[in-house]
Protein backbone atom coordinates (compact mmCIF):
# COMPACT_ATOMS: atom_id res chain seq x y z
CA UNK A 1 0.00 0.00 0.00
CA UNK A 2 1.34 3.43 -0.92
CA UNK A 3 1.89 6.09 1.75
CA UNK A 4 -0.91 8.15 0.23
CA UNK A 5 -3.33 5.24 0.45
CA UNK A 6 -2.93 4.65 4.19
CA UNK A 7 -3.59 8.20 5.38
CA UNK A 8 -6.52 7.11 7.52
CA UNK A 9 -6.14 6.08 11.17
CA UNK A 10 -5.58 2.38 11.73
CA UNK A 11 -7.96 2.37 14.71
CA UNK A 12 -11.73 2.65 14.26
CA UNK A 13 -13.07 5.97 15.50
CA UNK A 14 -15.27 3.99 17.92
CA UNK A 15 -12.15 2.60 19.60
CA UNK A 16 -10.58 6.05 19.81
CA UNK A 17 -13.73 7.32 21.54
CA UNK A 18 -13.50 4.45 24.03
CA UNK A 19 -9.82 5.23 24.54
CA UNK A 20 -10.62 8.86 25.34
CA UNK A 21 -13.31 7.79 27.78
CA UNK A 22 -10.90 5.40 29.51
CA UNK A 23 -8.29 8.14 29.93
CA UNK A 24 -10.97 10.39 31.42
CA UNK A 25 -11.92 7.65 33.92
CA UNK A 26 -8.28 7.08 34.88
CA UNK A 27 -7.82 10.77 35.61
CA UNK A 28 -10.97 10.74 37.73
CA UNK A 29 -9.68 7.67 39.60
CA UNK A 30 -6.59 9.59 40.70
CA UNK A 31 -8.43 12.85 41.33
CA UNK A 32 -10.77 11.02 43.70
CA UNK A 33 -7.72 9.69 45.57
CA UNK A 34 -5.88 12.98 45.83
CA UNK A 35 -3.02 12.05 43.50
CA UNK A 36 -1.47 14.98 41.63
CA UNK A 37 -1.10 14.82 37.84
CA UNK A 38 2.35 15.97 36.70
CA UNK A 39 4.03 16.60 33.37
CA UNK A 40 7.72 15.82 32.83
CA UNK A 41 10.02 16.08 29.77
CA UNK A 42 9.93 13.68 26.83
CA UNK A 43 13.62 14.44 26.24
CA UNK A 44 16.41 14.13 28.77
CA UNK A 45 20.15 14.79 28.88
CA UNK A 46 20.70 11.30 30.35
CA UNK A 47 19.13 7.97 29.57
CA UNK A 48 18.73 4.53 31.09
CA UNK A 49 21.64 2.14 31.56
CA UNK A 50 19.43 -0.97 31.36
CA UNK A 51 20.97 -3.41 28.86
CA UNK A 52 17.50 -4.45 27.67
CA UNK A 53 16.37 -0.96 26.64
CA UNK A 54 17.35 0.90 23.46
CA UNK A 55 16.72 4.62 23.18
CA UNK A 56 16.23 7.25 20.51
CA UNK A 57 18.90 9.94 20.52
CA UNK A 58 18.95 13.37 18.94
CA UNK A 59 21.14 16.47 19.17
CA UNK A 60 20.12 20.01 19.99
CA UNK A 61 22.08 22.99 18.67
CA UNK A 62 20.70 26.47 19.21
CA UNK A 63 22.27 29.45 17.38
CA UNK A 64 23.68 30.68 20.70
CA UNK A 65 25.30 27.35 21.58
CA UNK A 66 28.94 26.61 20.82
CA UNK A 67 28.43 22.89 21.19
CA UNK A 68 25.45 20.64 20.51
CA UNK A 69 23.68 18.84 23.32
CA UNK A 70 22.80 15.14 23.24
CA UNK A 71 19.19 14.45 24.17
CA UNK A 72 17.42 11.13 24.62
CA UNK A 73 13.73 10.40 24.21
CA UNK A 74 12.56 9.07 27.57
CA UNK A 75 11.74 5.38 27.90
CA UNK A 76 9.80 6.20 31.09
CA UNK A 77 9.21 9.32 33.21
CA UNK A 78 10.61 7.49 36.26
CA UNK A 79 13.75 9.54 36.95
CA UNK A 80 11.99 12.88 36.57
CA UNK A 81 9.04 11.78 38.69
CA UNK A 82 11.35 10.59 41.47
CA UNK A 83 13.06 13.98 41.41
CA UNK A 84 9.63 15.50 42.04
CA UNK A 85 9.03 13.06 44.90
CA UNK A 86 12.37 14.00 46.45
CA UNK A 87 11.35 17.67 46.18
CA UNK A 88 8.21 16.98 48.24
CA UNK A 89 5.49 16.55 45.61
CA UNK A 90 3.57 13.88 47.50
CA UNK A 91 1.66 11.20 45.52
CA UNK A 92 1.87 11.81 41.77
CA UNK A 93 0.84 10.27 38.46
CA UNK A 94 1.45 10.95 34.79
CA UNK A 95 0.05 9.78 31.47
CA UNK A 96 2.40 10.56 28.64
CA UNK A 97 4.33 9.40 25.61
CA UNK A 98 7.41 7.25 25.97
CA UNK A 99 9.81 5.95 23.34
CA UNK A 100 11.82 2.77 22.89
CA UNK A 101 13.96 2.00 19.86
CA UNK A 102 13.09 -1.67 19.86
CA UNK A 103 10.60 -4.08 18.39
CA UNK A 104 7.37 -3.34 16.58
CA UNK A 105 4.43 -5.71 16.49
CA UNK A 106 1.19 -6.84 18.03
CA UNK A 107 1.96 -5.40 21.47
CA UNK A 108 4.77 -2.99 20.65
CA UNK A 109 5.14 0.41 18.98
CA UNK A 110 8.24 2.61 19.33
CA UNK A 111 6.02 5.43 20.64
CA UNK A 112 3.46 4.49 23.27
CA UNK A 113 1.42 5.91 26.15
CA UNK A 114 2.44 5.05 29.69
CA UNK A 115 0.60 5.62 32.96
CA UNK A 116 3.04 5.87 35.84
CA UNK A 117 2.31 6.70 39.45
CA UNK A 118 4.08 6.82 42.81
CA UNK A 119 2.74 6.46 46.32
CA UNK A 120 4.94 7.69 49.20
CA UNK A 121 4.77 5.42 52.25
CA UNK A 122 3.04 2.60 50.35
CA UNK A 123 4.67 -0.81 50.42
CA UNK A 124 4.55 -3.03 47.33
CA UNK A 125 1.44 -4.89 48.47
CA UNK A 126 -0.60 -1.75 49.12
CA UNK A 127 0.23 -0.46 45.65
CA UNK A 128 -0.71 -3.83 44.16
CA UNK A 129 -4.12 -3.42 45.80
CA UNK A 130 -4.52 0.00 44.18
CA UNK A 131 -3.53 -1.33 40.75
CA UNK A 132 -6.12 -4.07 41.26
CA UNK A 133 -8.76 -1.44 42.11
CA UNK A 134 -7.95 0.48 38.92
CA UNK A 135 -8.14 -2.61 36.71
CA UNK A 136 -11.47 -3.66 38.20
CA UNK A 137 -12.88 -0.20 37.63
CA UNK A 138 -11.57 0.25 34.08
CA UNK A 139 -11.91 -3.30 32.74
CA UNK A 140 -14.87 -4.47 34.87
CA UNK A 141 -12.86 -7.60 35.68
CA UNK A 142 -12.55 -9.83 38.73
CA UNK A 143 -10.09 -9.07 41.50
CA UNK A 144 -6.58 -10.25 40.62
CA UNK A 145 -4.77 -13.39 41.71
CA UNK A 146 -1.36 -13.02 43.35
CA UNK A 147 1.47 -15.47 42.77
CA UNK A 148 5.13 -15.20 43.63
CA UNK A 149 7.70 -15.65 40.86
CA UNK A 150 8.89 -18.76 42.68
CA UNK A 151 5.36 -20.18 42.96
CA UNK A 152 4.73 -19.52 39.25
CA UNK A 153 7.83 -21.48 38.21
CA UNK A 154 7.06 -24.35 40.58
CA UNK A 155 3.47 -24.58 39.38
CA UNK A 156 4.08 -24.39 35.65
CA UNK A 157 7.67 -25.59 35.17
CA UNK A 158 8.30 -27.65 38.29
CA UNK A 159 11.59 -25.89 39.05
CA UNK A 160 12.58 -23.39 41.73
CA UNK A 161 14.02 -20.32 39.94
CA UNK A 162 15.77 -19.16 43.12
CA UNK A 163 17.75 -22.36 43.70
CA UNK A 164 17.77 -24.33 40.42
CA UNK A 165 21.22 -25.06 39.05
CA UNK A 166 22.31 -24.61 35.44
CA UNK A 167 21.47 -28.21 34.55
CA UNK A 168 17.90 -27.93 35.85
CA UNK A 169 17.35 -24.67 34.01
CA UNK A 170 18.67 -26.11 30.74
CA UNK A 171 16.51 -29.21 31.14
CA UNK A 172 13.46 -26.98 31.53
CA UNK A 173 14.48 -25.11 28.38
CA UNK A 174 14.69 -28.39 26.45
CA UNK A 175 11.20 -29.37 27.62
CA UNK A 176 9.93 -26.08 26.18
CA UNK A 177 11.70 -26.65 22.84
CA UNK A 178 14.22 -23.92 23.65
CA UNK A 179 17.18 -26.27 23.29
CA UNK A 180 18.72 -24.14 20.54
CA UNK A 181 19.59 -21.43 23.07
CA UNK A 182 21.10 -23.67 25.73
CA UNK A 183 24.55 -23.91 24.15
CA UNK A 184 25.02 -20.22 23.43
CA UNK A 185 23.25 -18.43 26.28
CA UNK A 186 25.20 -18.15 29.52
CA UNK A 187 23.29 -15.49 31.45
CA UNK A 188 21.05 -17.00 34.13
CA UNK A 189 18.53 -14.16 34.12
CA UNK A 190 18.12 -14.32 30.35
CA UNK A 191 17.45 -18.05 30.71
CA UNK A 192 14.85 -17.42 33.40
CA UNK A 193 13.17 -14.71 31.36
CA UNK A 194 12.91 -17.03 28.36
CA UNK A 195 11.49 -19.81 30.52
CA UNK A 196 8.98 -17.40 32.02
CA UNK A 197 7.87 -16.16 28.60
CA UNK A 198 7.50 -19.65 27.13
CA UNK A 199 6.41 -21.70 30.12
CA UNK A 200 4.56 -19.36 32.46
CA UNK A 201 3.10 -16.34 30.64
CA UNK A 202 0.79 -18.34 28.33
CA UNK A 203 -0.90 -19.98 31.32
CA UNK A 204 -1.49 -17.14 33.76
CA UNK A 205 -4.09 -14.38 33.94
CA UNK A 206 -6.52 -16.02 31.55
CA UNK A 207 -9.75 -15.22 33.39
CA UNK A 208 -8.60 -12.47 35.72
CA UNK A 209 -5.44 -10.40 36.15
CA UNK A 210 -2.52 -11.96 38.00
CA UNK A 211 0.24 -10.24 39.95
CA UNK A 212 3.62 -11.97 39.80
CA UNK A 213 5.79 -10.62 42.61
CA UNK A 214 9.18 -11.14 44.25
CA UNK A 215 11.32 -11.45 41.13
CA UNK A 216 14.92 -12.62 41.65
CA UNK A 217 17.15 -9.99 43.25
CA UNK A 218 19.32 -10.02 40.12
CA UNK A 219 16.29 -8.64 38.23
CA UNK A 220 15.61 -5.87 40.75
CA UNK A 221 16.19 -2.96 38.32
CA UNK A 222 15.24 0.06 40.49
CA UNK A 223 13.45 -1.97 43.18
CA UNK A 224 14.55 -2.63 46.75
CA UNK A 225 15.76 -6.06 47.82
CA UNK A 226 13.39 -7.80 50.22
CA UNK A 227 14.41 -7.54 53.87
CA UNK A 228 12.75 -10.92 54.51
CA UNK A 229 14.45 -12.86 51.70
CA UNK A 230 17.61 -11.42 50.17
CA UNK A 231 17.12 -13.65 47.10
CA UNK A 232 14.16 -11.61 45.84
CA UNK A 233 13.34 -8.02 44.92
CA UNK A 234 10.27 -6.03 45.93
CA UNK A 235 9.09 -6.00 42.34
CA UNK A 236 5.85 -7.10 40.66
CA UNK A 237 4.38 -7.43 37.18
CA UNK A 238 0.74 -7.69 36.10
CA UNK A 239 -0.54 -10.02 33.37
CA UNK A 240 -4.00 -10.41 31.89
CA UNK A 241 -5.15 -12.47 28.90
CA UNK A 242 -1.62 -13.00 27.65
CA UNK A 243 -0.60 -9.35 27.93
CA UNK A 244 1.99 -7.86 30.29
CA UNK A 245 0.26 -4.75 31.60
CA UNK A 246 2.37 -3.26 34.38
CA UNK A 247 5.68 -3.33 36.20
CA UNK A 248 5.98 -2.02 39.76
CA UNK A 249 8.54 -1.64 42.54
CA UNK A 250 8.95 -0.83 46.17
CA UNK A 251 11.50 1.74 45.16
CA UNK A 252 15.21 1.72 45.92
CA UNK A 253 16.05 4.91 47.83
CA UNK A 254 19.75 4.32 48.56
CA UNK A 255 21.79 6.54 46.22
CA UNK A 256 25.02 4.54 46.66
CA UNK A 257 23.29 1.25 45.83
CA UNK A 258 21.61 2.84 42.81
CA UNK A 259 24.96 4.20 41.59
CA UNK A 260 26.46 0.71 41.90
CA UNK A 261 23.59 -0.82 39.92
CA UNK A 262 24.03 1.73 37.13
CA UNK A 263 27.76 1.01 37.02
CA UNK A 264 27.07 -2.73 36.90
CA UNK A 265 24.68 -2.13 33.98
CA UNK A 266 27.46 -0.34 32.12
CA UNK A 267 29.89 -3.18 32.78
CA UNK A 268 27.32 -5.59 31.39
CA UNK A 269 26.77 -3.31 28.39
CA UNK A 270 30.51 -3.34 27.69
CA UNK A 271 30.60 -7.14 27.90
CA UNK A 272 27.76 -7.32 25.37
CA UNK A 273 29.36 -4.79 23.02
CA UNK A 274 26.74 -2.14 23.75
CA UNK A 275 27.57 1.56 24.18
CA UNK A 276 28.16 2.80 27.71
CA UNK A 277 25.51 5.20 29.03
CA UNK A 278 26.20 8.25 31.16
CA UNK A 279 24.64 8.01 34.61
CA UNK A 280 21.85 10.46 35.39
CA UNK A 281 23.62 12.55 38.03
CA UNK A 282 20.55 14.69 38.71
CA UNK A 283 18.60 11.56 39.60
CA UNK A 284 21.40 10.34 41.88
CA UNK A 285 21.51 13.79 43.52
CA UNK A 286 17.76 13.56 44.17
CA UNK A 287 18.25 10.20 45.88
CA UNK A 288 21.05 11.67 47.99
CA UNK A 289 18.75 14.52 49.00
CA UNK A 290 16.18 11.97 50.08
CA UNK A 291 13.54 9.99 48.21
CA UNK A 292 10.71 9.11 50.61
CA UNK A 293 9.89 5.43 51.08
CA UNK A 294 7.51 4.76 48.21
CA UNK A 295 6.16 2.32 45.66
CA UNK A 296 5.65 3.04 41.98
CA UNK A 297 4.22 1.35 38.93
CA UNK A 298 4.15 1.84 35.15
CA UNK A 299 1.13 0.59 33.18
CA UNK A 300 0.73 0.50 29.40
CA UNK A 301 -2.35 2.49 28.38
CA UNK A 302 -2.44 1.17 24.81
CA UNK A 303 -2.49 -2.43 26.05
CA UNK A 304 -5.16 -1.55 28.61
CA UNK A 305 -7.35 -0.17 25.82
CA UNK A 306 -6.71 -3.35 23.80
CA UNK A 307 -8.15 -5.42 26.63
CA UNK A 308 -11.09 -3.07 27.07
CA UNK A 309 -12.22 -3.33 23.43
CA UNK A 310 -11.02 -6.91 22.81
CA UNK A 311 -8.52 -5.78 20.18
CA UNK A 312 -5.89 -8.14 18.77
CA UNK A 313 -3.29 -5.53 17.84
CA UNK A 314 -2.12 -2.13 19.09
CA UNK A 315 -2.97 -0.69 15.68
CA UNK A 316 -6.65 -1.14 16.57
CA UNK A 317 -6.38 1.30 19.50
CA UNK A 318 -3.76 3.79 18.26
CA UNK A 319 -4.72 6.35 15.63
CA UNK A 320 -1.38 6.33 13.83
CA UNK A 321 1.14 3.62 14.77
CA UNK A 322 4.63 3.96 13.34
CA UNK A 323 3.64 2.44 9.98
CA UNK A 324 1.24 5.36 9.43
CA UNK A 325 3.00 8.07 11.40
Swiss-Prot record:
PROSITE patterns: AA_TRNA_LIGASE_II (PS50862). The keyword Oxidoreductase does not apply. InterPro entries: Aa-tRNA-synt_II, aa-tRNA-synth_II, aa-tRNA-synth_II/BPL/LPL, EpmA, Lys-tRNA-synth_II_C. Substrate binds at residues 76-78, 118, 251. It is an enzyme of class 6 (ligase). It holds the Pfam family tRNA-synt_2. Belongs to the class-II aminoacyl-tRNA synthetase family. EpmA subfamily. This is Elongation factor P--(R)-beta-lysine ligase. It comes from Hamiltonella defensa subsp. Acyrthosiphon pisum (strain 5AT).
